């Protein structure tokens, strides 16, 4: 029986490249001249710390970061930014988390979406991924299109396709 896995992974090398590109753009932008602003990638915690002198500039830095991530093939929804920024002294900062893996609540949403579609496939939650099996390859391709168009708030990759 053909099957594939639905996963949510972010390539940390691409994230590192995007952060370096954003830092390079930050150094050349006129509106950030003589301003203390930075991007810091923590690969261990999978977070990106954005720091600047005002909350408005932090929002601008987040826009730069999202644009650079998108250019590197990482969707903007793969980072989770808190609503409130931290303020200490004369700097504002925010720590954006990278979404890795599919948590159980999201996996249940995916399985429910697939079951509600009445496609002839079975979906199973296996840790941080969802395995989808079916008799026909066309059903699996329809399932991929369904999950991509599902607007679930997280980017998904489809791998381990077996016939």
Swiss-Prot record:
It comes from the Bacteria. SUPFAM superfamilies: YajQ-like (SSF89963). GO terms for molecular function: nucleotide binding. CDD domains: YajQ_like (cd11740). InterPro entries: DUF520, UPF0234-like_C, UPF0234_N, YajQ-like_sf. GO terms for cellular component: cytosol. Keywords: Nucleotide-binding. It holds the Pfam family DUF520. Nucleotide-binding protein. Belongs to the YajQ family. PANTHER family: UPF0234 PROTEIN YAJQ. This is Nucleotide-binding protein ESA_02876.
């Amino acid at each position: 029986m053909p099957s594939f896995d639905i996963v949510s992974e972010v390539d940390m090398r691409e994230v590192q490249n995007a952060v370096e590109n954003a830092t390079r753009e930050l150094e050349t932008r006129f509106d950030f001249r003589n301003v203390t602003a930075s991007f810091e990638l923590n690969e261990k915690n999978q977070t990106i710390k954005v720091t600047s002198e005002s909350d408005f500039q932090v929002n601008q830095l987040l826009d730069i970061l999202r644009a650079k991530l998108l250019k590197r093939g990482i969707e903007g929804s793969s980072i989770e930014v808190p609503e409130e920024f931290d303020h200490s002294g004369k700097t504002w900062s925010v720590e954006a988390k990278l979404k890795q893996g599919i948590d159980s609540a999201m996996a249940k949403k995916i399985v429910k979406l697939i079951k509600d579609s009445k496609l002839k496939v079975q979906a199973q939650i296996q840790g941080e991924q969802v395995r989808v099996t079916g008799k026909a390859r066309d059903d699996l391709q329809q399932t991929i299109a369904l999950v991509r168009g599902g607007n679930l708030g997280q980017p998904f990759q489809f791998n381990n396709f077996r016939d």
